């Protein structure tokens, strides 16, 4: 496990099961409040695809030895303070909190090569400051047709922006050119945020 003092420990973080998008918003909010100088190096990352069927390993909700689960989408927090240092904070993983980017991606997403195309993962990477401003959810996606909750909501009020009552779908959507941030395939995501020690050494020459 590496050390990163954005968050003292996982127990100090706001967490409600099945509300990963709000859990990550709260992490962004915490950085803005306690470490504002780091906010520009932080991101909210949505994982999904067109069919909203994305397999992830090493998840607390997963089954079997590999702890695999298929989500419609997932969200995690990422801190990228320098070219050779990128850390993932995932409140739903069984991996350490935080985990180095390469280890997290390797164990959580493995490879798309062994998966059917409809299960390939795509990533919407949103700067933390943008996420704090633009994310808005009235939690309608967690209600049944009769109005009851699929999973109990957080005790705090819904996170609503000044311009939109509910825009969660824009963040889950993986169509380039729609929604905030940038959309990457798995290979593009790794290429953009993982720099091996050799690559960093060559860049610094």
Swiss-Prot record:
As recorded in UniProt, its EC number(s) are 3.5.1.122
The record, for InterPro entries, names: N_Gln_amidohydro_ab_roll_sf, NTAQ1, Prot_N_Gln_amidohydro_ab_roll
Q: Name one Pfam family in it.
A: Nt_Gln_amidase
Q: Where is the active site?
A: 20, 74, 90
GO MF annotation terms: protein-N-terminal asparagine amidohydrolase activity; protein-N-terminal glutamine amidohydrolase activity
Keywords, alphabetical: Hydrolase
> Any one cellular component term from GO for this entry?
nucleus
Gene3D superfamilies, per the entry: Protein N-terminal glutamine amidohydrolase, alpha beta roll
Q: Which reaction does it catalyse?
A: N-terminal L-glutaminyl-[protein] + H2O = N-terminal L-glutamyl-[protein] + NH4(+)
UniProt entry tagged with the keyword Hydrolase: yes
As for what it does, the entry says: Mediates the side-chain deamidation of N-terminal glutamine residues to glutamate, an important step in N-end rule pathway of protein degradation. Conversion of the resulting N-terminal glutamine to glutamate renders the protein susceptible to arginylation, polyubiquitination and degradation as specified by the N-end rule. Does not act on substrates with internal or C-terminal glutamine and does not act on non-glutamine residues in any position.
What the record says about family reads: Belongs to the NTAQ1 family.
Subunit structure and binding partners: Monomer.
Provide the protein name: Protein N-terminal glutamine amidohydrolase
């Amino acid at each position: 496990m590496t050390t990163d003092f954005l968050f003292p420990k996982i127990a100090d973080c706001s967490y409600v099961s099945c509300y990963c998008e709000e859990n990550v918003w709260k992490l962004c909010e915490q950085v803005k409040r306690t470490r504002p100088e780091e906010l520009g190096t932080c991101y909210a990352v949505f994982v999904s695809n067109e069919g909203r069927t994305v397999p992830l390993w090493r998840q607390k909700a997963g089954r079997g030895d590999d702890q695999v689960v298929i989500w419609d989408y997932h969200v995690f927090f990422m801190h990228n303070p320098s070219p050779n240092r990128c850390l993932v904070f995932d409140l739903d993983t069984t991996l350490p909190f935080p985990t180095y980017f390469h280890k997290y991606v390797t164990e959580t997403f493995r490879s798309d090569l062994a998966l059917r195309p409809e299960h390939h993962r795509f990533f919407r990477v949103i700067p933390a400051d943008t996420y704090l401003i633009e994310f808005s959810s009235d939690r309608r996606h967690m209600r049944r047709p009769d109005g009851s909750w699929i999973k109990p909501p957080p005790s705090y009020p819904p996170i609503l922006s000044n311009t939109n009552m509910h825009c969660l779908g824009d963040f889950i959507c993986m169509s380039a050119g729609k929604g905030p941030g940038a959309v990457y395939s798995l290979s593009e995501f790794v290429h953009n945020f993982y720099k091996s020690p050799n690559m960093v050494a060559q860049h610094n020459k």
